[in-house]
Amino acid sequence: MALAGLPLSVFAIAVHFCLVFSSSSSPPVCPANGHRDRTAYHFQPAKNWQNDPNGPVYYNGMYHLFYQYNPHGALWDVGNLSWGHSVSGDLVNWAALDNALDPTAPFDANGCASGSVTILPDGVPVVMYSGIDARRRQVQNVAFPKNPRDPLLREWTKPGYNPVIPVPADVSPDNFRDPTTAWLGSDGLWRFAISAVADGVGATLVYRSADFLRWERNAAPLHASRDAVMAECPDLFPVAEHGEDGLDLDASAIGGAGAGVRHVLKVSMPDTLEDYYMVGRYDDADDTFTVPPEDLEAHGDDYRRWRRIDHGHLYASKTFYDAGKKRRVLWAWVNESDSEADDVTKGWSGLQSFPRAVWLDEGGRQLVQWPVEEIETLRRKRGVLLGGNEVEAGGLREIGGIAGSQADVEVAFEIASLAGADRLEPDHLRDPDALCGENGAAVHGGIGPFGLLVMASGDLRERTAVFFRVFRLSHGYTVLMCTDLTRSTSRAGVYKPSHGGFVDIDIEKDRAISLRTLIDHSIVESFGGGGRTCMTARVYPEHVATGSSHLYVFNNASDAVKVSKLEAWELATASVNAGDDGLISYGGPVCAAQVQ
């Protein structure tokens, strides 16, 4: 649906979404534009490069996603970075609007970099973003909607008094960016956090303001590392100590150490391309973030030792509060793993992860992430496990009846005994990626590997494995979750690592573990242990050019495992930033269903 020239009301957008998905017929097995790697229900623009999610916000009954976008090509080009903009009524189907921000003024002449959206007390949203100015310094700017009554927020203006925050004298001019969503403290002052390298040390700084225009930096950083690597794309948000409801960034939740509220500080590390977080308490009296002593001792000040948002291919995550459903929702950039030449041929690069609801688990130290419930509106045909629910040692059971390239699968495994668990030495706990690489899906073990084979060819020469292993420690047991990409494609020039992470569950008590996997052509998102350990992967199998993908449950353990639950659904194709003819611009090879 083209938005230009139409009566752009919330009603019109909603009617369009309803008309597109009123049919209950099964979807095609190809993504919307026919390119074999293009996704069917993950967010991506019609063409070109995208990266960080910026300023996701729920405003006047609509979801807005702004994102880093190069409107001129499929590769990263900082000088052309703009803010792309799309709107949705359900976080699944999206309509593209014109760019919200383009590099036009001296204070952002070389790019409109990352930032956030804040809703002011009068209901007007304001963008704060990092501009790269004419001298290539990173400065902080604001922008306002041209018409605040427009529910789609189609046009934005950048005041001439920008930048509102120039580069401080002690801060590196090319390491001062990514302002967070702002919050009002209990003293009535606005605050936001921002990444910087100050006096040669990577730090998360806090600024305060009474009017959102004149800002003063807090004397002490919110948090600082011990080296010069900047922790970028910070996010600070409150979480309830109990329950799954999200909390807004208001004074009652973000300020002080209020009862029933904890806080999460998340950063993205450019040297590892991973997102890390810690659960602690933020106090707006002195703008400090503290963590429990036991966590500080275990993880220290090095961000790379903190917990990971995702143990796979995911970066620059950003959350927002969804007031409509009282939840906190996380977005993140998922980059390509093929070559730049492939991206140029396709005409696009980069996805957003499927939006995830986020809350604090009952232990109070880690986040739980789960796909937002709206994904269920795409469910069509239901799959069945062929051959029974007990999978013998070395067994393989196909999940039949659905298209394996566009699915939502949730499976639970029961383990009768832990007696056969392999021994794991303590030093192997430090590097789960390496442990998964050494113990791939084809390496038989005591309890595990067992899990799913996804995007698999009929002859199994190409397959992506998502699986678990249970290990015995000197003080109990631990569960390792892996995504093995080493056989995901026969194509040359593709990054095919093994991702790994430990799942914080009591396997000795539960004797069961769950896995949910979203499969969408070239992306596989997996959630282990009810969402306590998450892994995102990019896959580019060659077999989809001439045939269909298969989906299996496998078990390479020494004993049988029981599948106590299986819910597998084929998913319809969402309407994501489609053009006038309902299609997406693309290049390169098409998938099998459109070749025939």
Swiss-Prot record:
Residues 1-25 form the signal peptide. It is found in: Secreted, Extracellular space, Apoplast; Secreted, Cell wall. Disulfide bonds join C436-C482. Its main location: secreted. It comes from the Eukaryota. The keyword Ligase does not apply. It is an enzyme of class 3 (hydrolase). GO terms for biological process: carbohydrate metabolic process. Pfam families: Glyco_hydro_32C, Glyco_hydro_32N. CDD domains: GH32_Fruct1-like (cd18624). Glycans are attached at N80, N335, N556. The keyword Cell membrane does not apply. InterPro entries: ConA-like_dom_sf (IPR013320), Fructan_Metab_Enzymes (IPR050551), Glyco_hydro_32 (IPR001362), Glyco_hydro_32_C (IPR013189), Glyco_hydro_32_N (IPR013148), Glyco_hydro_beta-prop_sf (IPR023296). Expressed in roots. Weakly expressed in flowers. Coiled coil: none annotated. The active site is at D52. It catalyses: Hydrolysis of terminal non-reducing beta-D-fructofuranoside residues in beta-D-fructofuranosides. GO terms for cellular component: apoplast. Its EC number is 3.2.1.26. Belongs to the glycosyl hydrolase 32 family. This is Beta-fructofuranosidase, insoluble isoenzyme 6.
